[in-house]
Amino acid sequence: MEVGGGSEECCVKVAVHVRPLIGDEKVQGCKDCVTVIPGKPQVQIGTHSFTFDHVYGSTSSPSWMFEECIVPLVDGLFQGYNATVLAYGQTGSGKTYTMGTGFKGGSQTGIIPQVMNALFSKIENLKHQIEFQLHVSFIEILKEEVRDLLDPTFLNKSDTASANTGKVNVPGKPPIQIRESSDGVITLAGSTEVSVSTLKEMGACLEQGSLSRATGSTNMNNQSSRSHAIFTITLEQMRKLNPVSGDGNPNDSMSEEYLCAKLHLVDLAGSERAKRTGSDGMRFKEGVHINKGLLALGNVISALGDEKKRKEGVHVPYRDSKLTRLLQDSLGGNSRTVMIACISPADINAEETLNTLKYANRARNIQNKPVVNRDPMSNEILKMRQQLEYLQAELCARGGSGEVQVLNERIAWLEAANEDLCRELYEYRSRCTIVEQREMDAQDGSPCSVESDGLKRNLRSRESRDNQIVETMIGGDSREIEEGAAKEWEHMLLQNTMDKELHELNRQLEEKESEMKVFGGHTVALKQHFGKKIQELEEEKRAVQQERDRLLAEIENLSAGSEGQALKVHDIHAQKLKSLEAQIMDLKKKQENQVQLLKKKQKSDEAAKRLQDEIQYIKAQKVQLQHRIKQEAEQFRQWKASREKELLQLRKEGRRNEYERHKLQALNQRQKLVLQRKTEEAAMATKRLKELLEARKSAARDNLAIANGNGTNGKINEKGLQRWLDHELEVMVNVHEVRFEYEKQSQVRAALAEELAVLKQVDELDSKGPSPSRGKNGCARGSSLSPNARVARISSLEHMLGISSNSLVAMASQLSEAEERERAFTNRGRWNQLRSMGDAKNLLQYMFNSLGDSRYQLWEKGIEIREMKEQLKELVGLLRQSELQRKEVENELKLREQAVAIALATSATGNSPISLKHIDDDVKSSSSPMSVPAQKQLKYSPGIVNGPARESAAFIGQTRKMIPLGQLPMKNLVANGQAGNGKLWRWKRSHHQWLVQFKWKWQKPWRLSEWIRHSDETIIRARPRSQVLTYRV
């Protein structure tokens, strides 16, 4: 492959991807120490600020990075430019997630899957104009060995080698070697390149290689990549060109242009520290090789990124590792490169994050020279065609002869014939493609299916012909048939509608008839009823008429008689009528009176009933009120009891909170003092280191000036070298001191974060509801605090965590600067100022003397430590003896208490006359020594044996003052008690005073031992100092 086209320099584009805090970092209480400036591609950590081409924070979308950084590289790939995407950063910073090398099951997460989609989408749009061929390869560099992840033989061996991630030796297959062609292109001899034509095939290759890649678990990452992986996509394209003829018209002849470009997608293994990852054995060796390759990459970036070195033509150490050798074109060569720096925002990773940002900032200065990669033959043909066109144009301008015109016509005829032949060739090629496709289908299916497919095709063709004939014959009748079908369909719909309506009418008619039958039955019954009534009325009418006729007959008979009798009868009837009318009036009055009485009675009954109802209602209300009063009283009693109980609990809680508050205040104050002291120590160490680093430059210049002087300044030069060596050693010690303070501060922050996590967990559990038990001691300890105390403690811990995080970031910055200066100083040469062998010998002699003095001091310190250990052993032995004596004294005190209790009980009952002399004799007969209680004098704690030597020595010094009290006679004890105004002198006066003395004490038997101890102490304090017996140690 040969490069063509004009080359233009372009810088390496750098993008920074800040991942969010992960779960483990949140549990540890890590704070975000990286700040992304809104609206600007800037990132800030501590006092350092960096500007890059692109910065993506934790809230940025992954599609933004692809659209802004990767899409231009994919477009350039179709133009023939090589491209490289490089993911660099600390272990666990999200490089594999960002690149997408952990491809599984069609996942679209990461840059590589998006690149594949964009590639095939663009190929689909251009496949009618350009012929494409795609090849992929996938390798990894594990422990400086290149492994092919797409090799089938390697895949068969990968399962057996999964326990050991070392080199897999495949029989009969040579190892992959890195070669460089004559034109400077880096190639891999022996690697597998797979041709792919679909997105699915390329995804299968990526997934296959991802599963074969070496991974492992560390303390910082469960799925840590243990190798550098490079996924390469090679795009070959054949472009067809239409050259222009000499007369300016487009020529029919076709020419081809072959372009080949590569896209390297590099997922580097993360830099790691063995102390933090906790790796050992095989993991440790892998980490060493990873850091070695990244160090070589950093040296290459430093050499290419320094403009001064680049102008001076300083050697670039590409050959220091296989990683830099493979990335030789990507860094400073024929490629467009984008470097993605993945960083962690956690303050615990501040040092590694700062180093990553410095490397990325240095990589921005690297200048690449990308060019279009063309085939040598096509490039030469293109040049010759351009030259031919130029000559033809010049010939036409000068006016050619007739022979030239004939030749031009012949050329045009030949080109037309060539074009016809090309068309025929294209048709034949398309037919061959169809035939090949049919052959593939025939191979996939059975002969019967192939034959049936052919018959079906023939049948379809004949049916199509028949259909065409029928359409031509009955084309005119089709409209009439369609109209008849439409009318028939409309009639059917109308008929169905009318049937439905008829059915509905029938149903309604049946309902009305049934209603009429019901109404007819009622009419007959009414006719019968009213007929009977009419007959009854007619009978009554006839009876009344008969009565009337009879009365008229009587009247006629009477009128026919004499008038006297008529008058007499008339008078009689008149009197009877008057009497009857008088009776009727009386009856009416009585009836009215009865009616009034009935009304009054009804009113009184209603009033009585109303009163009775009111009485019942009042009684019910009375019962309800009594029941309610009882309930209210019970509720008030319960409420009062609960309030009193709550008041007691609140008082108790208040006392406990007050105690906890004082305790937490003391703890916070102590932790703040410790944290402040450690922060001040760290600040002093970093300040001292900074001053030493600044002084190193001036000292180096002074030493260089002294070294360039004449020979008379030999003594001065020697002293200067000695001062320079002392200064370098002091710088090294201070760097170690700052590193030690950094580790201590990390441990303190981890402890604070653990306590904060426990308290937040307890707070969350309490907010959800009280839990029956706590699984961990930390949770139990956190649950013992009250909510207010817990909130105060959480706030204090968060404040201290903030201080600790700021201190960690500051120390990480100083350590990074110190390491960078040390690396730069080491690269320039530490011993360049040694100008002669004599200076080297003098400096070596000085170093030997200093080392001897250090060894002597170390030997003396070792002797002192051994002596102190022996003293500590003796003190621990004495302490154990004192503890044994203390236990014996406690046993003796228990025996004495039991004896005193028996004596008191016996004296109180009067059953047995036991005097104090028997107790005195019992005490005299005891041979075990009695000492002053250690709990009061020494503040004894069970763990004092494991305490520091200073406390042990103080304890032994106090035990020397202990007195064998049991050896003293009771008379001396009594006398001493009397002299010291004690209470034992009253015991010997009489039995009555004995009882009086113990009367109120015996009411509290649990304080008897305390009272006896207090009496013993009083006696001991009252003894003269000359009589005190001490132990000799």
UniProtKB/Swiss-Prot annotation:
Domain Kinesin motor as annotated: residue spans: 11-366
GO cellular component, one term: cytoplasm
MF (Gene Ontology): ATP binding; microtubule binding; microtubule motor activity
List of residues binding ATP: 89-96
Chief place where the protein resides: cytoplasm
Pfam families, per database record: Kinesin
Listed Gene3D superfamilies: Kinesin motor domain (3.40.850.10)
Record region (Disordered): 443-462, 763-785
GO biological process: cell wall organization; microtubule-based movement; mitotic spindle organization; spindle elongation
Role according to the record: Kinesin-like motor protein involved in the control of the oriented deposition of cellulose microfibrils.
Record text about domains: Composed of an N-terminal domain which is responsible for the motor activity of kinesin (it hydrolyzes ATP and binds microtubule) and a central to C-terminal alpha-helical coiled coil domain that mediates the heavy chain dimerization.
Protein name: Kinesin-like protein KIN-4A
Lineage: Eukaryota, Viridiplantae, Streptophyta, Embryophyta, Tracheophyta
